[in-house]
């Protein structure tokens, strides 16, 4: 899946994603998507974090030259979910997971598919070497729908549906996010003790 507003920032982005998706244990692989101003839009999703406790976009609005948490932007790593803005899934695994829920809008559909793949025993991977730009024609109004964690603020019905569907998974916490880190955002900073 590739959002129509994505812009290729490197020639090898598809080969990067394909190289990871060929591994049998990988459900979905996503790339890093940045805004034209050089800040991160999508770089994996952490479960149970953010204002709505559903999922938060990792490193949202931080500079895209950020090294990540312990340098994890320098290597591929598992994440609970990836955005469908830039996502590659084997058709076989997509079909086995039941595909995307047509009742869900963008981002929520990718989040849901990622969790279905994880439930089936697959891992989802962020490949920081697959980089895309995002240039929506109405960027200001488009992104006004997201808060500081990259969560969509005007999609209460979508959020509630996914929180109900995945409540048990979310309650357990994200297996790739240290419990000592803040639950306010997925910037991987220490929480309050």
Q: What residues fall within each predicted segment?
A:
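Repeat-solenoid scaffold signature
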Residues: 7-9, 16, 132-145
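A short, conserved alpha-helix in the catalytic core of glycosyltransferases
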Residues: 14-17, 77-98, 103-131
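Residues immediately flanking
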Residues: 4, 54, 91
């Amino acid at each position: 899946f590739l959002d129509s507003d994505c812009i290729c920032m490197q020639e090898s982005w598809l080969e990067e994603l394909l190289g990871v998706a060929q591994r049998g244990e990988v459900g979905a692989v996503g790339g890093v998507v940045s805004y034209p101003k050089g800040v991160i839009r999508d770089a994996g999703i952490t479960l149970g974090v953010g204002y709505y406790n559903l999922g938060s976009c990792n490193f949202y609005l931080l500079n895209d030259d950020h090294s990540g948490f312990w340098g994890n932007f320098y290597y591929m790593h598992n994440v609970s979910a990836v955005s469908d803005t830039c996502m590659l899934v084997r058709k076989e695994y997509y079909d086995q997971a039941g595909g995307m829920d047509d009742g869900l809008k963008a981002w929520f559909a990718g989040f849901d598919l990622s969790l279905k793949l994880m439930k089936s025993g697959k891992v989802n991977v962020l490949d920081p070497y697959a980089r895309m730009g995002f240039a929506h024609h109405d960027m200001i109004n488009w992104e006004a729908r997201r808060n500081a964690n990259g969560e969509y603020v005007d999609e209460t019905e979508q959020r509630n549906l996914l929180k109900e569907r995945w409540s048990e998974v979310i309650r357990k916490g994200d297996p790739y996010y240290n419990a000592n880190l803040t639950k306010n955002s997925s910037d991987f900073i220490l929480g309050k003790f």
